[in-house]
């Protein structure tokens, strides 16, 4: 079996689990309820950037995204999804293997992104723009599992 087929099977298993496991289903509903679209043109409130005693450290490692995030278990961790602006999960349903697809293959992220609200506010406008550069729009999705 090639990698693409294996990726599709893994995603199908994730989909099955997210639909049939009540804890995962509840977690997905909770994440979707807290999910927020932030337009690139939206003005963000002033931020107090001096709230931590120690300065941020930037660490470059060979770890995969969720592997690196797991190191900070129990803390509030944000993961940057280098995402497709036109397809939720990129090509995860077809077995593609870039970063977004990997995130969606092993979590409930795809099922949070693939909602009517996000299609209307994020994916369809980007498709209609026909601009490969897209813009600075953001989807914030809390508490992915």
What are these model-predicted stretches?
Residues 1-145:
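Macrodomain-like recognition of ADP-ribose-binding/processing modules
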